[in-house]
Structure formats: C-alpha cells, structure tokens
C-alpha cells in the first residue's frame, strides 16, 4: 500500500505543471491491446476471457471500485509493487491501460 501512495505522489509531482487535458492523453483501444498482452495471464481483462491463472481481481471489478480513477491505476502500474510483476510500462502505456479499465466501469 505504501508503494501505491508513493506512486500517486510521483504521478502528481510529474503532472503538477500540466493542465488537466494534457496530463494523460490516454488511448483506451491501445490499452485494451496492452492489457491482453501484459495482464491477461493473471487478470480477466475483457468479456471474452472467462478465466485467469491467478486469484486476482478482474478488470471489471477494479473499474467498479468506488475510489477508482484512471490516474490512480496508471500511477500504480508505473511504481514497482510486490503483488504484481513489474512490467516495463511507459507512462503512456500505463495511462492507456488505465483508460481501458475505465471503459469497463458500468
């Protein structure tokens, strides 16, 4: 949890000088492609996938959390964390995956 908040602080510091529209220009379609490549081994990332190999939340459950924001998820993906492999995602890729997860919030 400490790493999660550290990631949020890093994200806020990195984007503090940017206006809201340019802080994260995310591409949800690209995020879906990345999620299928990097995340689908452990997470259920879309409706076509019925099962994952780890006991982790599906992306729909992440999207529906009351405190979900794409910014929080993107920051979490950038910062190394012990519960998940540390994928070499760029800030743009993390934002794209977070934007895709946001599309699942219904």
What is the meaning of each model-derived region?
Residues 88-106:
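C-terminal capping alpha-helices of c-type cytochrome domains
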Residues 1-11:
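Bacterial N-terminal signal peptides that target proteins for export
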Residues 16-34:
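Electrostatic cytochrome c docking/interface patches
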Residues 36-45, 97:
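The canonical Cys-X-X-Cys-His
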Residues 47-74:
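Gly/Gly-Pro-rich "capping" loops immediately C-terminal to redox-active cysteine motifs
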Residues 70-78, 95-98:
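An amphipathic alpha-helix signature
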Residues 29-33, 41, 51:
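N-terminal secretory signal peptides
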